[in-house]
Every structure is written in structure tokens, then in C-alpha cells.
């Protein structure tokens, strides 16, 4: 087992209200969670303050997106400075829904990564291929290109978690098999070794996202290069506790 600390992020996406999220937070606050796992919940921006004020301090909070500058005439956007002002330490960037629903480019995501790290926010940087890309055999090309743009904008890797999320497995009920996940994670680590450094390759956590459940999390967590999860739908349910404790 690696020395990398297991990391589980919950991405609530555009879900929940104060009542339902309050119940979820109560479940997390009273659950027995593995001390050897970092836990971070990605709340909708309008509930960041609420989530931070209600969640136990051992659980981190992440924004689900932000913009690439500190302030200005960018209606509807939030900045890393605002996120920090709410006591939040993390942000999710480059999620496939940002890329494919909202048309965010690799370049924009890279600029956001750079600005967030300069602002002392931790970054959960997402990468992953679409179904047609996997079927065409271009998975490596796609994820390496996405990773390169992120890497070009990182000076300090200690605040970065890489999240591999095959787009065909997000919210579809299809999961990459433990072997498929391990294969891509291992290749990503190899890319970091060749293009960044041995130290970064050995220390950066590469987490898996895509229909992770209480039922499949233990087998995925047993893979050598799977250092945790970014969980969507299941992070809104009590089974999120089982996923957090996948390595217990």
C-alpha cells in the first residue's frame, strides 16, 4: 500500500437544499470515519457558507468551480478569494460537466488551476475521456493532453489531487472495472514520472470518479494507483460513509 493518504471527495453538483443537505451533514458528522482518509465535500456555491458552518472541521469543503481572476465584471462567477473568504480550502476544476455542458477549454481550466493555486486553494483537477474516445483507443492521448495543460500551470503539487473520471462512467451506472481504472492511473503516474518528476509521481494522489458506490468502492480502493474517489450521486446518500471507509 502506498504512503499517499487516501482522499475521498463528494461532489454534490446542483443538488440538495438546506433541509436535505443538513440531514446529510448530520450523518457525516456523527459517522465513524477513517482517520487515515481526507474527506472533502463539494457544495453548490450558494451553500458553501452553510456547509462550512455545519460540517465537522475534520471534513473539508470544496467549491465546484470558480473563475480565473480575483474580482471584476464577470456576472454569475465566483473567485478563489471569495471561496477562501468563506473558509473553504478546495475547489473542483475541469469536471467533465464543466468541459462538455459549459464548453470550458483545456486552456481555461489551466488558467483557473494556476490562479487557484496562487490563491492558496487546494485543487481537485479532473480529467477523463468520452466513450467514443475510449472506443477509438485514444484514452491515453486525451488524458495525457488534459494532464499536460494542468501540469503546465502547477508550481506546487502538494495542493493538487488529480481525479480521473471516464466521462462514459459518470452518472451512467457504468463503472470502469478496477483493472481499467488501475491501468489508466498507472499510466498517468508514468506520465508524471516522465514529464514532471519522480517525487511528484510518487506523492500526487490520483483518485477515481465514475459511478462509485458502496458496493464497488472496496475493490477499486485496493488498486495500487487508486488513491481515493470523487463521488457524485452516492455522496448525497448515507452510503457515502462506506465509500469514505473503503480502505478501513
From Swiss-Prot:
It comes from the Eukaryota. It comes from Danio rerio. It holds the Pfam family TIM. The keyword Lyase applies. This is Triosephosphate isomerase A. GO terms for molecular function: methylglyoxal synthase activity; protein homodimerization activity; triose-phosphate isomerase activity. Pathway: Carbohydrate degradation; glycolysis; D-glyceraldehyde 3-phosphate from glycerone phosphate: step 1/1; Carbohydrate biosynthesis; gluconeogenesis. HAMAP family: TIM_B (MF_00147_B). Substrate binds at residues 11, 13. InterPro entries: Aldolase_TIM, TIM_sf, TrioseP_Isoase_bac/euk, Triosephosphate_isomerase, Triosephosphate_isomerase_AS. Its main location: cytoplasm. The active site is at residues 95, 165. Its EC number is 5.3.1.1, 4.2.3.3. GO terms for biological process: gluconeogenesis; glyceraldehyde-3-phosphate biosynthetic process; glycerol catabolic process; glycolytic process; methylglyoxal biosynthetic process. The keyword Nuclease does not apply. Belongs to the triosephosphate isomerase family. It catalyses: dihydroxyacetone phosphate = methylglyoxal + phosphate; D-glyceraldehyde 3-phosphate = dihydroxyacetone phosphate.
Amino acid at each position: 500500500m502506498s504512503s499517499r493518504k487516501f482522499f475521498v471527495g463528494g461532489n454534490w453538483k446542483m443538488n440538495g437544499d438546506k433541509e436535505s443537505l443538513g440531514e446529510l451533514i448530520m450523518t457525516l458528522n456523527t459517522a465513524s470515519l477513517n482517520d487515515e482518509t481526507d474527506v472533502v465535500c463539494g457544495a453548490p456555491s450558494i451553500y458553501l457558507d452553510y456547509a462550512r458552518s455545519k460540517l465537522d472541521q475534520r471534513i473539508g469543503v470544496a467549491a465546484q468551480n470558480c473563475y480565473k481572476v480575483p474580482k471584476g465584471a464577470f456576472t454569475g462567477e465566483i473567485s478563489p478569494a471569495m471561496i477562501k473568504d468563506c473558509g473553504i480550502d478546495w475547489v473542483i476544476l475541469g469536471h467533465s460537466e464543466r468541459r462538455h455542458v459549459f464548453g470550458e477549454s483545456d486552456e481555461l481550466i489551466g488558467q483557473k488551476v494556476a490562479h487557484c493555486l496562487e490563491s492558496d486553494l487546494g485543487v481537485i483537477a479532473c480529467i477523463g475521456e468520452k466513450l467514443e474516445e475510449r472506443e477509438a483507443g485514444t484514452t491515453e492521448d486525451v488524458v495525457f493532453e488534459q494532464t499536460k495543460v494542468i501540469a503546465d500551470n502547477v508550481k506546487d503539487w502538494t495542493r493538487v489531487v488529480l481525479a480521473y473520471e471516464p466521462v462514459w462512467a459518470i452518472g451512467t451506472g457504468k463503472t470502469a472495472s478496477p483493472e481499467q481504472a488501475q491501468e489508466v492511473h498507472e499510466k498517468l503516474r508514468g506520465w508524471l514520472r516522465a514529464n514532471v518528476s519522480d517525487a511528484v509521481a510518487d506523492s500526487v494522489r490520483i483518485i477515481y470518479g465514475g459511478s462509485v458506490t458502496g458496493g464497488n468502492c472496496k475493490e477499486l480502493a485496493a488498486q495500487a494507483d487508486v488513491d481515493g474517489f470523487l463521488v457524485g450521486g452516492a455522496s448525497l446518500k448515507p452510503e457515502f460513509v462506506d465509500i469514505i471507509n473503503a480502505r478501513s
